[in-house]
């Protein structure tokens, strides 16, 4: 107390130094300044685990992401992750739809967007093989003739447009949402294309009828289709058929023909020079809605008209249907109802455009060499009966947020973790440790935790959700209990069981017993079969053969390895397997008793016991009684934890002992009269596995309730006056009318932490608000009840396991009703050993209760007096009644 007062005064002097003119103002100083200094002690939250989550966007796949957490070597690290937020990226395609009379169907150039490379790519496009000096893949070497080269590539061109090469088809799944938009030609010929394929128009100043082209010479009048007779075209560009005007028109009426000027470019879908086509497009208008071919006067089709789009054979856009126009955008929005390939086609035919065959597929069959092909092109008249040309540039986007990603794609996504000694961002080339969806292991070293997603798929998007937690509490208790005590015992009994088993099967007497039992079994079986007393079925024969094989294998040298691998390990490892999987929160995966560490972290928390000690000092309002109940309940609960540990050890020892005796019981399964002993042996092994598992399940359920109740029993405490000091003088009993009391401003009482509990009043005595006396009292009783439940779990679980496995515990000698409880017997022995220490620790408590609380003193008997006890300050205890009467 002197030290406490000195400390308080020292703090006051430091906070408020005295000055000469202060006089006695220090007497008016209170302890309110200390309140802000010491503050309040809050009820702690049980945070043995550091938990958090992170969302890793697939756009950052391959890069390490910081969690901001540090982990400790040998302590639990849990990582759970989900790909529920991952969806397929919208599949993007650039499509160039072009009319070319050399192909029976429209040309369709397709470029696919590769998300991993962030580029478009024209897969399977029949490009030229270039020399090593060319900087542009697919470029034509300057010393080669375009037409001669392309003649040998005609078959590749046909295969490309028939999807028989490696070019990608646009696949659509049922439920996919398809969006097709018209775009400018620059969008298709984007420079962001792999290997620079189709980044520019396919064109040449030299006419090559066997080469591929992309232009239609529409210039600024792109995304349009022309289908008109030669007469309608010529009536616009040269109605008079002026021979001095080189228009390419000849003939009149139905005999009108049109031929490209200075070349035969109409063969490749370029019927006019750029200037001429611009002039022609300026003279015609857009065709009316739902107009067919050969509309008079000539007109052009736009907004996708003239093109049919199908998915799996189902038409999603009719030929005469226009794209929806919104501002500058023209698009079609469609949700697929079936699986299939998207196809761009038209029912307008190109056949009969010329009098001679212009199909590239016919040229391949007819001409075996280039000179004969050139002669055919140069010697024929390529005047067109009608003109059908033009193109559309489109971007196709296909997505489906409702459909989940495929199983193959899911398997390709992986998560890795990495632990580094410092917080420096690791290099992406550093490999991490892969984890499954529910990963739990001990951290291999101390350091900072990093996570990353490895995603080899280029067509998915979204966020991978990762929840991670690591244990941050102490592990001293489980290290002592498991590594220091239990593991040596279990390892020793494992070795004992193995050695005893091996010695047993090598014993000549045991081997003779096995051989005799097998011989007797076969003889009895044969006699019963001969006598007709045995009705054999296929199952009966297989069962008897298996029994003979198992017992015969028992006396072989590899008997232990066989039975331990395929049978005994089910029980020896099964008990650890069940306990490990039942436990949720644990400090270490390698320590099966790691679940005790979080429990001890909760119930040995220094703040909890500090607040309980503060409540112990509240004798005047009954909080001390609540604290005593809580402390006693915790001690009872700790004893229950000890029972769980002892129950596990006894169960494991029982399993190893039963396994060591396995040869005797396995022999007994041969005969029906002894088979019940074998069955009981199996039931006993099973009961030893089930008992600690069920016990732990009940124990953990009670622990969850206890954690909540404990936080309600312990209350917040703030720095305040613990014991008020009041000086008073009352002389009224002497006839002097003086009666006053006062407190010292500088020392109103003994300061300390005081529980933040409202005083009892009529308004709150029966309320159930938090921290009222009624709530604290009822909660402490509930806490005590739950602790008593945990204390009686062993007996209850023994009864439950006995009902399940039909294995009844032995009875106590002389008491048929009482069952033997090995755990209870061990606890009773521990109690006997600790009784002297318990009694010694209770002596100060009894003295405190007797002398201070009850104020009950016993004095030595005076000479001639009688020893008696009475209340302190009420009567003297060291004199007799006779002496007291004499004084009066």
Swiss-Prot record:
Source organism per entry reads Rickettsia prowazekii (strain Madrid E)
Q: What is this protein called?
A: Uncharacterized protein RP107
Disulfide-bonded cysteines: none
What is an example of a Pfam family matching this protein? TrbL
Q: How does it sit in the membrane?
A: Multi-pass membrane protein
Primary location recorded for the protein, binned into one broad class: membrane
Cellular compartment(s): Cell membrane
- Give TM regions: 513-533, 565-585, 611-631, 649-669, 682-702, 781-801
| Record family assignment | Belongs to the TrbL/VirB6 family.
InterPro entries, A to Z? Conjugal_tfr_TrbL/VirB6 (IPR007688)
Give UniProt keywords alphabetically: Cell membrane, Membrane, Signal, Transmembrane, Transmembrane helix
Q: For this chain's UniProt record, which GO biological process terms are given? A: protein secretion by the type IV secretion system
GO cellular component terms attached to this protein's record:
plasma membrane
Q: Report the leader peptide range.
A: 1-20
């Amino acid at each position: 107390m002197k030290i406490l007062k000195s400390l308080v005064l020292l703090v006051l002097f430091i906070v408020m130094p005295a000055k000469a003119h202060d006089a006695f103002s220090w007497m008016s100083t209170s302890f309110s300044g200390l309140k802000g200094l010491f503050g309040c002690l809050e009820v702690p939250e049980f945070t043995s685990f550091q938990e958090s989550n992170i969302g890793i966007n697939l756009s950052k796949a391959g890069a390490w992401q910081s969690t901001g957490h540090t982990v400790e070597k040998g302590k639990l690290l849990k990582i759970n992750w989900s790909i529920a937020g991952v969806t397929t990226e919208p599949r993007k395609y650039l499509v160039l739809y072009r009319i070319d009379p050399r192909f029976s169907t429209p040309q369709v150039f397709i470029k696919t967007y590769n998300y991993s490379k962030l580029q478009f790519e024209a897969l399977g496009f029949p490009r030229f093989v270039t020399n090593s000096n060319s900087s542009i893949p697919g470029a034509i070497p300057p010393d080669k003739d375009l037409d001669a080269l392309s003649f040998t590539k005609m078959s590749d061109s046909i295969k490309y447009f028939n999807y028989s090469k490696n070019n990608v088809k646009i696949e659509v799944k049922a439920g996919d949402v398809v969006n097709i938009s018209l775009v400018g030609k620059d969008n298709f010929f984007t420079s962001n294309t792999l290997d620079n394929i189709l980044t520019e128009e396919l064109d040449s100043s030299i006419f090559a009828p066997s080469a591929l082209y992309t232009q239609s010479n529409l210039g600024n009048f792109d995304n349009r289709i022309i289908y008109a007779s030669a007469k309608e075209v010529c009536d616009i560009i040269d109605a008079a058929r002026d021979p001095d005007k080189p228009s390419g028109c000849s003939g009149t009426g139905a005999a009108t023909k049109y031929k490209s000027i200075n070349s035969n470019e109409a063969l490749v879908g370029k019927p006019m020079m750029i200037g001429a086509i611009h002039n022609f497009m300026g003279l015609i208008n857009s065709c009316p809605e739902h107009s067919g071919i050969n509309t008079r006067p000539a007109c052009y089709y736009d907004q996708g008209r003239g093109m049919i789009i199908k998915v799996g054979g189902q038409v999603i856009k009719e030929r005469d249907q226009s794209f929806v126009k919104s501002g500058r955008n023209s698009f079609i929005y469609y949700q697929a109802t079936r699986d299939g390939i998207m196809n761009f086609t038209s029912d307008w035919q190109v056949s009969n455009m010329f009098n001679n065959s212009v199909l590239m597929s016919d040229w391949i069959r007819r001409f075996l060499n280039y000179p004969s092909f050139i002669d055919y092109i140069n010697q024929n008249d390529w005047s067109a009966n009608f003109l059908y040309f033009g193109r559309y540039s489109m971007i196709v986007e296909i997505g489906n947020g409702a459909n989940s990603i495929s199983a193959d794609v899911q398997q390709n996504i992986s998560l890795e973790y990495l632990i580094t000694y410092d917080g420096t961002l690791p290099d992406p080339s550093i490999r991490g440790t892969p984890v499954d969806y529910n990963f739990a292991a001990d951290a291999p070293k101390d350091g900072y935790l990093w996570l990353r997603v490895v995603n080899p798929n280029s067509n998915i998007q979204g966020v991978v959700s990762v929840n991670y937690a690591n244990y941050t509490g102490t592990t001293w208790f489980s290290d002592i209990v498991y590594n220091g005590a239990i593991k040596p015992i279990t390892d020793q009994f494992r070795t004992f069981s193995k050695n005893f088993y091996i010695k047993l099967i090598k014993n000549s007497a045991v081997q003779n017993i096995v051989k005799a039992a097998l011989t007797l079994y076969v003889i009895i079986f044969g006699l019963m079969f001969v006598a007709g007393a045995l009705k054999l079925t296929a199952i009966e024969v297989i069962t008897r053969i298996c029994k003979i094989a198992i017992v015969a294998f028992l006396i072989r040298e590899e008997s232990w390895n066989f039975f331990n691998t395929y049978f005994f390990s089910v029980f020896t490892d099964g008990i650890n397997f069940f306990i490990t999987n039942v436990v949720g929160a644990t400090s270490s995966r390698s320590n099966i008793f790691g679940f005790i560490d979080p429990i001890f972290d909760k119930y040995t928390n220094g703040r909890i016991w500090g607040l309980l000690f503060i409540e112990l000092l509240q004798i005047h309002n009954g909080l001390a009684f609540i604290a005593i109940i809580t402390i006693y309940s915790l001690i009872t609960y700790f004893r229950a934890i000890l029972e769980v540990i002892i129950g596990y050890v006894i169960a494991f020892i029982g399993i190893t002992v039963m396994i060591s005796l396995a040869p005797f019981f396995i022999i007994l399964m041969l005969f029906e009269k002894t088979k019940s002993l074998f069955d009981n042996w199996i039931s006993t092994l099973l009961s030893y596995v089930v008992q600690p598992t069920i016990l732990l399940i009940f124990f953990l359920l009670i622990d969850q309730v206890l954690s909540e109740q404990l936080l309600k029993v312990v209350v917040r405490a703030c720095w305040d006056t613990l014991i008020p000091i009041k000086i008073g003088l009352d002389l009224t009993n002497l006839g002097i009318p003086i009666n006053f009391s006062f407190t010292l401003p500088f020392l109103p009482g003994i300061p300390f932490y005081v529980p933040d509990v409202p005083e009892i009043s009529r308004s709150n005595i029966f309320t159930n608000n938090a921290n009222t006396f009624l709530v604290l009292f009822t909660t402490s009783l509930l806490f005590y009840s739950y602790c008593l439940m945990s204390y009686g779990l062993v007996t209850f679980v023994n009864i439950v396991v006995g009902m399940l496995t039909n294995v009844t515990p032995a009875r106590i000698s002389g008491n048929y009703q009482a069952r033997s409880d090995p755990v209870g017997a061990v606890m009773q022995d521990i109690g006997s050993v600790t009784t002297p220490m318990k009694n010694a620790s209770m002596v100060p408590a009894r003295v405190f209760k007797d002398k201070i609380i009850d104020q009950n003193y016993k004095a030595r008997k005076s000479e001639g007096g009688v020893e008696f006890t009475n209340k302190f300050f009420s009567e003297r205890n060291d004199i007799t009644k006779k002496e007291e009467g004499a004084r009066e």
